[in-house]
């Protein structure tokens, strides 16, 4: 879905269409349980999972412009039907951009994990740390504070893992590498996805 189309919809309309599209895809090709489920914002939507991880059964249920709060509110539609063995989550970037505090985002991830485990106690999760993007560089300190809190939470449960992408996405000047982003300075380029795929691969076993 194009960004322009998303912005023309209300949040309720946007989510209704996204969930209807997922339902249609599931009816056409029902995904078996035990897959690796990717959820989150446009960073997940744009990831070519079949190309990046050809040997792994993946399901992409990313939604444009979505937040971590959105994921928590829709676990029954985004997660539970798929009974995944592993969830890969990238979300929270948009929450921070909308004014949420680091503490609020970290609490949302804790809620997400506990709500999933209430129904799927064996499911593991990988939280991809919030990325340092050129467009949102002014928010990097809040992003890093969020990452620190979520990393700390992940260290207390073997079902959780935190994938830190911050340092490897910076150049010699300690600023985000432009080659890892498309022109908008927010979304990942093919080089960015290649880097992330390499970093994530060991977690998918």
Kindly give the residue locations of the regions a language model identified.
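Alpha-helical cap/lid subdomain in secreted, periplasmic
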Residues: 51-53, 73-205
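Serine-esterase "nucleophile elbow" of acetyl-processing enzymes
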Residues: 4-85
